[in-house]
């Protein structure tokens, strides 16, 4: 019986390390290497505060990112060395309510 050797193929899967801001709620900083903020602007780091490790994540598409697009994250990491995820804009409940009230009254006038 002849043995067949199958070469191991190492995929160059991109990983990122995600940090939570100590100063800003729902703000996250993605970097390529753990504790390496050398490519992050100093002013951004001051506003971000002490980074708190949230998780390490492969960017191979198996896990969905929350509030971030995978391709934008990959592009930002390769081009500038970091990606900053800001919180989603707050819902304007008053505006939504007034809009729905306005729609209801205009349809009732007909």
Swiss-Prot record:
Biased amino acid composition, Polar residues: 97-110
Pfam families given in the database record: YcgL (PF05166)
Alphabetical list of InterPro entries matching this protein: YcgL-like_sf, YcgL_dom
Residue ranges annotated for the YcgL domain, each copy included: 14-98
Region of interest (Disordered), residue spans: 87-110
Matches recorded under PANTHER family: PROTEIN YCGL
Protein name as annotated: Protein YcgL
Organism of provenance: Salmonella newport (strain SL254)
């Amino acid at each position: 019986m002849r043995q067949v050797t199958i070469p191991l193929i190492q995929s160059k899967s991109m990983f990122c390390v995600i940090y939570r801001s100590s100063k800003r709620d729902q703000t996250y900083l993605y970097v390529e290497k753990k504790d390496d903020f050398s490519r992050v602007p100093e002013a951004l780091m001051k506003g971000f505060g002490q980074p708190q490790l949230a998780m390490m994540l492969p960017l191979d598409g198996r896990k969905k990112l929350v509030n971030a697009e995978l391709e934008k994250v990959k592009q930002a990491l390769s081009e500038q060395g970091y990606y900053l995820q800001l919180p989603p804009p707050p819902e304007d409940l008053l505006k939504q309510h007034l809009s729905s009230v306005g729609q209801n009254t205009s349809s009732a006038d007909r």
